[in-house]
């Protein structure tokens, strides 16, 4: 693949959306939890590096959270990876019956609060996460708990349809892809974790988060995160499998564009989304400012976190070894992979 000089700076995020990641002390705690639930294999080098990669997102997504908040975010990331890897890691290949069986079992974890005797590590982490969120929310915050559960079920249910898109890749349409991907990216459960972390006393009226503008704002951020992920993972996916479900790739085919033109198309689309989001956010905050005066700081923190997460995804992507290489088409990712040796001596803790 020819090296291009593309830049993520062509995506015009407002300066106010930028954040700095927090510290990493929570990683060891969550690693031990995942070992106990048999999500990871103890002292396995691959699992240790995977754990760092997966849980590192928490400090970028929730930079202002306390230790418990960072742990909750990291647990969610481990669950995402552990379940998705059953499908992406080649464990069940194209066995559709097994795919539906795993989806139905995981849905029962969140819908019924039950777990099978022969549970997988992903199911154990999901069960633990569900019960933990329920305990945190208590009786006063049942709406938050149920919306978190619903968002997790929605993500689980998105996996098989997204797999099926791969089988129809020759006729893949950008709008169809975006519709599926904004749920499959897994950002909506993250938004609910933000609400749990940033409004601990549940002072904010729950109906506010049912406003159609807030729901649309959430979906826009999902789209932004999904498309940025396609950009930063483009080279990696091309090398691994030809990137059949990468928008930067299939837009080239669909519209007969080169890589530069395809990225220009996506960056323009992203910039339109950002502008649309800003308009909605301004209207949303203005509408509820009079009734949120008693807890305005929490309300604003949750709203700001929604857009901050989209830039945090960019920040994380430009430093994770997962995407760095000397042949990256994106200038911000074009350097040697970092060797993770001093993050945590997880084997000896």
From Swiss-Prot:
Motif window: NDxxSxxxD/E motif: 229-237
InterPro entries: Isoprenoid_synthase_dom_sf (IPR008949), Terpene_cyclase-like_2 (IPR034686)
UniProt keyword list: Lyase, Metal-binding
Enzyme kind, highest EC tier: lyase
Induction trigger: Expression is detectable but at low levels in vegetatively growing cells and increases during development induced by starvation. Expression is highest during slug formation (approximately 16 hours after induction). Expression decreases during culmination (from 18 to 24 hours after induction).
Source species: Dictyostelium discoideum
Notes concerning its domains: Contains several highly conserved motifs that are important for catalytic activity including the aspartate-rich 'DDxx(x)D/E' motif and the 'NDxxSxxxD/E' motif, both of which are involved in complexing metal ions to coordinate the binding of the isoprenyl diphosphate substrate in the active site.
UniProt-listed GO biological process terms: sesquiterpene biosynthetic process
Name the UniProt record assigns to this protein: Terpene synthase 2
